[in-house]
Design a protein with these regions (language model features):
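Phosphate-binding/switch loop-helix module in NTP-utilizing enzymes
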Residues: 77-126
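Phosphate-binding/switch region of NTP-binding enzymes
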Residues: 116-171
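Short acidic, S/G/P-rich loop/turn micro-motifs used as interaction or catalytic elements
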Residues: 31-33, 61-62, 101-107, 130-133
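Conserved P-loop
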Residues: 20-84
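N-terminal pre-Walker A segment at the start of P-loop NTPase domains
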Residues: 1-14
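Short, well-ordered alpha-helix to beta-strand connector turns
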Residues: 22, 50, 92-94, 120, ...
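Structural recognition of alpha->loop->beta junctions
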Residues: 15-16, 74-80, 141-152
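Alpha-helical scaffold elements adjacent to nucleotide-binding pockets in ATP/GTP-utilizing enzyme cores
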Residues: 65-69, 113, 140-144
Length: 171
């Protein structure tokens, strides 16, 4: 039996494998580890090659530092939309990044409802981590997603259901 994937290639396929439409992913790490930088670059890649992307910059907002990151990463594409919140209607997006779940005060039930209500949309949830390096939130968050990316000191480590767990430099 064959299953259709989104056709992910390059460094992101090496990091998380070959996800299908509607996948979900958790990204976590300590402050200033490179989470947002990696996710903006991933959003850019998805917008350039795979469809419409919403990047909900709840934590940082659309201010000078976000504008600087977008310019530095050359993350300007007609399919990449930046918002300071999560719009009620997400049907026009193939991929939605929520940066961050912690700052947006989105609980696990709300995350599951987003996924359930938008089955063809992939969600990438960004979480803060504790001083010990574990992600904030209940363990159910990790069980409910298809892949997990830990960003640690500028290096992203992926693992999940798509057969590959790799690593890549962020900075």
């Amino acid at each position: 039996m064959d299953f259709e994937t989104i056709g992910l290639e390059g460094k992101y396929k090496e990091l998380i494998g070959a996800p299908s439409a509607g996948f979900s992913c958790m990204v976590y790490g300590k402050p200033k580890s490179g989470k947002s930088t990696m996710c903006i670059d991933f959003a850019k890649h998805l917008a350039e090659h795979h469809g419409n992307v919403l990047y909900a910059a709840i934590e940082e907002g659309y201010g000078y530092t976000m504008k600087e990151k977008l310019e530095r990463l050359k993350a300007t594409h007609k399919n990449l939309y930046i918002s300071e919140n999560i719009p009620h209607k997400l049907s026009k997006f193939d991929f939605v990044f929520i940066d961050s779940v912690s700052k947006g005060k989105v609980d696990n039930n709300q995350l599951n409802e987003l996924i359930k209500s938008n089955p063809k949309t992939a969600f990438i949830f960004i979480f803060h981590s504790t001083k010990e390096g574990d992600f904030r939130g209940g363990q159910e968050n990790a069980h409910d997603v298809d892949c997990i990316i830990e960003v640690k000191e500028g290096v992203a480590f992926g693992k999940g259901r798509f057969g590959i767990g790799g690593e890549m430099g962020v900075f």
